[in-house]
Amino acid sequence: MRLTERDLELLRWINGHGFVTARQAANWMGTCLQTGHRRMGLLHQGGYLKRQRLFHGAERAYWLSALGQQVSGDTLSCPETISPATYRHHWMMVDLAHDLITKTKGQFTPERRLREQRAIKGVGAEGHVPDGLLEVKSKKPIAIELELTLKGRERLEGIVEGYLDRDLSAVWYFVTSDRIQRRLNSIIDGERLFKIKPWQPRS
């Protein structure tokens, strides 16, 4: 299989998120679902991608193999496996990132890339890393958080307090339930840096 520059970009995009589905790859490529499945299948057959269906009825996950990382020139290590515990949050983040890019025409950096950048700068493991950063034109970055479960109050308070010291234009919390929204509202208490946005994933 002869890889194009677009294929290499696709591999690096996949690795930034950890894994994606064929549907999500089709969205990124701006093609139909059939084309997305075909391209991902060819990359898998060529040994550049691994794939697995983690749950019955779920979309199949694709992620980079060692060969895929090598040919793409990506410095970010590819996952060995996909964790069932984080599968739902990860694939929803890919959809959310696509929605944000489509609506704002901005650039999105996923958590894995942010952690890599932090390691390169030698910052270590201090401080909370958001689920992503959205950059829109000349504005300061917007931290993106996707909350699917109700975190403990003390933990959320620590994360919110930490954001107040960062050079951000906003922190957007996307929530999937009223209960999570109420918890966050009680902690944020009107602080203008934060916005809470109800969001529902694709079925």
Give the location of each predicted region.
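Catalytic cores of nucleic-acid endonucleases
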Residues: 141, 148-192
